[in-house]
């Protein structure tokens, strides 16, 4: 754990929960696994305060705990990744609001504040009931108020779950809704919204193994694998490989928090997208089939329908257990945010229509992709194996696209009048009500969709891959290649901003050719020797390129030594991540300093009689100062959100 990452986690926990919890967390982060008496001794806190703080940190999944079977002592360990995820709370709330509406965002905001909660408790909260609208604050950083941590988690704690007040980063009111968007059904019950969130995978069931560190879970699984007898007769490396494989399967099974595999994820996805496209509460609801092994196998009962009126209805779903304990699934949100980034990249490389086709493909893949990577720790570049997503049938993608989308208008050689390959004056049914045969004047809709995806699959992008399965055209995505492409684009953007376009050329040459001496590098990059040396010196001093000395003989004389330049993308990536942690910490520290300068004014604006009536109770000078402060805070928080995007690309995707 680096210095700046620890500093950032401490600032985030302090701003969200208070200094008591940050003190306990940073002690565990610096000293590793510790029992309760040692925490009390070294933090100079009372046992009651430590138990109180650990109870809240455990409920927020910021601290792991494990009781040893040998001595019965409970050890606590910090979870720094969960602490860092606090910075993405605003993005998570905004994403849920865009897809499922304000009430779903309110539920997710409540879960983020509580850490985890029973479904029955969420259903009992007045602010989450139909007809009660509260502003959902999301700024890309936090957007969550820490409240009173009540006994709602179903886990026995030694102390009452009470949290300090948490400062909300957002000061500008609720987030604006997207154009043309309205909540599809403001009367939906909490149970229905939770089913929608579960279908997207945005919430997950809390299991006992989620409170233990991955190392403890693996050790327990390894002991179970040794005792089951499946490895009888194996020795040496084969025995070790077999035990490791069985242990990983057990850990995956123990930590699988999917609420239900029978939820109609594909049908729900189509229903939500259509509700976002048009607010039609009177549309007939059709019974949706449950998912099979592949989500693209889900079809309507009447194959002739185009799903345009499909909607989600709670009666078709199994009700969630009221005693189930749930929490926010950060890993699934990372998948959704990665897909959003890929859609933006596809939009830059193609047309808006092509990016919409790609968005539809990724939306079907997303519901079946639980995590961005199988292993949390980053694998060195060049050692990662290919990771293909599930394959989605071409006709499924075509059926889910907007029927009014002009697929032919941006493809050369296709007559724009034949949009989707169907005559404009043709009806779906004849006068007797029976289906008629389509007289196509142009390419079919499936062909046009296939052309858009083929454009994305071509070099050098490789956004998707075409496959044939059982005689059907399917499309998949190779995520590891795209994640590598995103990382390289971000690093090249940083290098160009700091050293210019010629530096990007040098980096690309070194990445493609490996180690090169200055003369050979000059020949390939087509640069003057003076300019090349100047740029190499600047990049070497900043740590972006390195120089290796290879002596020609044992004397090691400078005249008999080769100097080879090389570029290590993994080292540069980790260096940039550390610098980003430092920049984020400095932004949050600056916010605290500026807030301290205006302490009395901000305390005045937080009064219940002043909040919302600033024009009445504040003077003109105070209003101007408050406006300047909010602009400054918005600027700094926006910078933190932008830096978090960089960390996500370089570390998580």
UniProtKB/Swiss-Prot annotation:
Composition skew (Acidic residues), residue ranges: 293-309, 424-433
Nucleus as UniProt keyword: yes
Keywords assigned: DNA-directed RNA polymerase, Nucleus, Transcription, Zinc
Main location: nucleus
InterPro entries found in the cross-reference section: POLR3C_WHD, RNA_pol_III_RPC82-rel_HTH, RNA_pol_III_Rpc82_C, RPC3, WH-like_DNA-bd_sf
Region (Disordered) location: 141-186, 280-309, 422-442
UniProt-listed GO biological process terms: DNA-templated transcription
Alphabetized GO MF terms: single-stranded DNA binding
Subcellular location: Nucleus
One Gene Ontology term, aspect cellular component: RNA polymerase III complex
Record keyword RNA-binding present: no
Ranges of Basic and acidic residues composition bias in the record: 159-170
Pfam families to which the protein is assigned, alphabetical: HTH_9, POLR3C_WHD, RNA_pol_Rpc82
Region of interest called Leucine-zipper, as start-end residue ranges on this chain: 580-601
Function summary: DNA-dependent RNA polymerase catalyzes the transcription of DNA into RNA using the four ribonucleoside triphosphates as substrates. Specific core component of RNA polymerase III which synthesizes small RNAs, such as 5S rRNA and tRNAs.
Subunit structure: Component of the RNA polymerase III (Pol III) complex consisting of 17 subunits.
Family assignment from sequence similarity: Belongs to the RNA polymerase beta chain family.
Entry protein name: DNA-directed RNA polymerase III subunit RPC-3
């Amino acid at each position: 754990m680096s210095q700046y990452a620890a500093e950032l986690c401490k600032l985030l926990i302090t701003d969200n929960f208070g200094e008591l919890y940050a003190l306990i967390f940073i002690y565990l982060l610096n000293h590793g696994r510790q029992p309760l008496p040692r925490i009390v001794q070294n933090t100079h806190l009372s046992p009651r305060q430590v138990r109180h703080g650990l109870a809240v940190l455990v409920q927020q999944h910021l601290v792991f705990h494990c009781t040893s079977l040998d001595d019965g002592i409970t050890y606590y360990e910090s979870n720094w990744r969960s602490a860092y995820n606090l910075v993405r709370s605003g993005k998570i709330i905004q994403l849920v609001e865009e897809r499922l509406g304000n009430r779903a965002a309110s539920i997710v905001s409540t879960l983020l504040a509580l850490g985890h909660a029973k479904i029955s408790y969420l259903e009992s909260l007045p602010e989450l009931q139909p007809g009660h609208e509260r502003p959902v604050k999301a700024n890309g950083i936090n957007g969550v108020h820490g409240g009173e941590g009540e006994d709602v988690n179903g886990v026995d704690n030694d102390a009452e779950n009470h949290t300090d007040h948490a400062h909300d980063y957002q000061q500008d009111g609720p987030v604006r809704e997207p154009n043309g968007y309205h909540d599809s059904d403001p009367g939906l019950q909490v149970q229905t919204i939770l089913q929608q969130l579960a279908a997207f995978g945005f919430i997950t069931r809390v299991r006992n193994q989620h409170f233990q560190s991955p190392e403890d879970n693996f050790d327990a699984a390894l002991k179970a694998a040794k005792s089951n007898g499946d490895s009888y007769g194996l020795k040496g490396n084969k025995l070790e490989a077999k035990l490791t494989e069985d242990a990983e399967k057990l850990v995956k099974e123990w930590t699988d928090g999917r609420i239900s595999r029978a939820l109609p994820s594909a049908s729900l996805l189509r229903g939500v997208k259509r509700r976002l496209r048009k607010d039609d509460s009177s549309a007939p609801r059709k019974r949706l089939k449950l998912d099979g092994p592949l989500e693209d196998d889900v079809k309507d009962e009447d194959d002739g329908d185009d799903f345009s009126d499909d909607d989600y209805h709670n009666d078709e779903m199994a009700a969630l257990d009221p005693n189930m304990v749930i929490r926010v699934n950060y890993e699934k949100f990372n998948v959704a945010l990665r897909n959003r980034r890929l859609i933006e990249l596809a939009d830059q490389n193609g047309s808006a229509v092509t990016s919409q086709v790609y968005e539809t493909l990724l939306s079907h893949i997303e519901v079946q992709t639980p995590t961005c990577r199988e292993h949390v720790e980053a694998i060195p570049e060049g050692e990662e194996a290919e990771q293909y997503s599930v394959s989605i049938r071409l006709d499924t993608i075509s059926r889910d696209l907007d029927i009014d989308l002009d697929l032919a208008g941006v493809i050369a050689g296709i007559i724009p009048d034949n949009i989707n390959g169907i005559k404009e004056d043709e009806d779906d049914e004849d006068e007797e009500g029976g289906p008629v045969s389509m007289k196509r004047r142009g390419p079919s809709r499936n062909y046009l969709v296939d052309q858009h995806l083929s454009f994305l699959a071509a070099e050098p992008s490789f956004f998707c891959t075409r496959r044939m399965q059982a005689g059907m055209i399917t499309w998949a995505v190779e995520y590891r290649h795209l994640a590598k492409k995103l990382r390289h684009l971000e690093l090249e953007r940083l290098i160009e901003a700091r050293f210019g376009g010629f530096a990007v050329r040098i980096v690309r040459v070194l990445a493609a050719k490996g180690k090169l001496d200055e003369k050979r590098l000059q020949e390939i990059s087509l640069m003057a020797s003076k300019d090349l040396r100047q740029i190499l010196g600047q990049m070497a001093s900043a740590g972006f390129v390195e120089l290796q000395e290879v002596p020609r003989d044992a004397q090691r004389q400078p005249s008999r030594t080769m100097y080879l330049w090389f570029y290590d993308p993994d080292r540069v990536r980790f260096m940039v991540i550390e610098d980003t942690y430092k920049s984020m910490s400095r932004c949050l520290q600056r916010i605290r300093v500026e807030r301290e300068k205006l302490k009395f004014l901000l305390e005045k604006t937080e009064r219940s009689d002043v909040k919302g009536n600033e024009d009445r109770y504040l003077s003109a000078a105070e209003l101007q100062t408050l406006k300047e402060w909010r602009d400054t805070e918005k600027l700094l928080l926006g910078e933190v959100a932008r830096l978090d995007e960089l960390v996500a690309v370089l570390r998580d995707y």
